[in-house]
Amino acid sequence: MSSGKIVQVIGPVVDVEFSLDQSLPDINNALVVYKNGEAKQKVVLEVALELGDGVIRSIAMESTDGLQRGMEVIDTGKSISVPVGKDTLGRVFNVLGDTIDLEAPFPADAERSGIHKKAPAFDELSTSNEILETGIKVIDLLAPYLKGGKVGLFGGAGVGKTVLIQELIHNIAQEHGGISVFTGVGERTREGNDLYYEMKDSGVIEKTAMVFGQMNEPPGARMRVALTGLTIAEYFRDVEGQDVLLFIDNIFRFTQAGSEVSALLGRMPSAVGYQPTLATEMGQLQERITSTKKGSITSIQAIYVPADDYTDPAPATAFAHLDATTNLERKLTEQGIYPAVDPLASSSSALAPEIVGEEHYEVATEVQHILQRYRELQDIIAILGMDELSDDEKVLVGRARRVQFFLSQNFNVAEQFTGQPGSYVPVAETVRGFKEILEGKHDNLPEEAFRSVGKIEDAIEKAKQLNY
């Protein structure tokens, strides 16, 4: 193993000089610096650039506090490697694969795998037309998720992306019992902490591995932590032959960290200040998140939309890789409709009669049609009032409002805030409920009875409680 010396430290960027008679470390190799010569006080760097004359530029995965010029740097000869396998379930890791959950130390002889890999070859890929039931009505009806597919949850600040991800983890773990990998990329540490203890209390943690590189960490860690989580998921897919769920919260922070690293490396910025390699970095991550003949990875990714601008390069680049998009809309949160999923903007390649069935497809398209017509009539209602509408239009508006409210429901993970028990609604019940509303079977019930309920029977029961 070759060794060099630190010649410059600029925040998270460390320049290291190797003597010319040694071979330079490869790009993406992990380098280690021992502060005060102690193994416990090590800092891991990743090679990013070769500057010439035996000098390389690296990005630190941890704080560079305490590093000085002249300190020895050792080339490990390989990329950052993290623990994989069944022992990772129930544990919490950082970007380097070190446990951070205060439980018993992780076995030193555990199998490890490098975080930099090639995407599966074209002939290894597999596709599936099987629907993944989430128990969330608006998703299952209008933008269903495919097993082994890629889903993006798009939304601005505070519209409910993380809560929706937490509910999906809860529902899929409770109902399907599959293995999950949760990757927190540049999000709030408090949310990660809450999620860990909630999963521990519900027993879901036993089938989940968690990886965090949160807001307070250097950009190198935030950029690479998504690869750490993906590496753990890939092992379950390729070696164990499992169907894995990979949750990433938040893909935008991955892009943001890449932008910071790019600026630190002195690259010329591209549109809106993003890194020129944005599409390449996103492609390298997303192409590895796929299903093969051995197993599948179904990924659900929260994607923050800066200033609610969907044309921003970060969310726009992610769009191209997704099978389904769930768009969260701020106007719906203002109306108290949760989850605030926009039923007209959300889409899925799985909403086709040959995949979901004729009845489901017809009900979904009719729901979209009635909501679109209601949206067109809203201007007339706002200016002239309901009295100017024809009788047919009044009936349509009434049903559309019932449909809009029925698309909302209480979440299990939000019970501590709302005081209302959450509901899991099977797809068949969802389709039946909306079909009955569209047929006018519940035109006599007040609109408010449909807000935040589960099955259609819950709406009928709520109407009785409203003394209707």
Swiss-Prot record:
Oligomer and partners: F-type ATPases have 2 components, CF(1) - the catalytic core - and CF(0) - the membrane proton channel. CF(1) has five subunits: alpha(3), beta(3), gamma(1), delta(1), epsilon(1). CF(0) has three main subunits: a(1), b(2) and c(9-12). The alpha and beta chains form an alternating ring which encloses part of the gamma chain. CF(1) is attached to CF(0) by a central stalk formed by the gamma and epsilon chains, while a peripheral stalk is formed by the delta and b chains.
Subcellular location: Cell membrane
Family: Belongs to the ATPase alpha/beta chains family.
GO cellular component, one term: proton-transporting ATP synthase complex
Chief location category: membrane
Catalytic activity: ATP + H2O + 4 H(+)(in) = ADP + phosphate + 5 H(+)(out)
Membrane topology reported for the UniProt record: Peripheral membrane protein
Keywords carried by this UniProt record: ATP synthesis, ATP-binding, Cell membrane, CF(1), Hydrogen ion transport, Ion transport, Membrane, Nucleotide-binding, Translocase, Transport
Function per UniProt: Produces ATP from ADP in the presence of a proton gradient across the membrane. The catalytic sites are hosted primarily by the beta subunits.
NCBIfam families: atpD
Highest taxon above the source species: Bacteria
Binding locations of ATP: 155-162
EC number(s) given by UniProt: 7.1.2.2
This protein's name: ATP synthase subunit beta
Signal peptide per UniProt: none
Species classification: Bacteria, Bacillati, Bacillota, Bacilli, Lactobacillales
Pfam families per UniProt: ATP-synt_ab, ATP-synt_ab_N, ATP-synt_VA_C
Enzyme class: translocase
GO molecular function annotation: ATP binding; ATP hydrolysis activity; proton-transporting ATP synthase activity, rotational mechanism
CDD domains per UniProt: ATP-synt_F1_beta_C (cd18110), ATP-synt_F1_beta_N (cd18115), F1-ATPase_beta_CD (cd01133)
UniProt xrefs under InterPro entries: AAA+_ATPase, ATP-synt_VA_C, ATP_synth_F1_bsu, ATPase_a/bsu_AS, ATPase_alpha/beta_chains, ATPase_F1/V1/A1_a/bsu_N, ATPase_F1/V1/A1_a/bsu_N_sf, ATPase_F1/V1/A1_a/bsu_nucl-bd
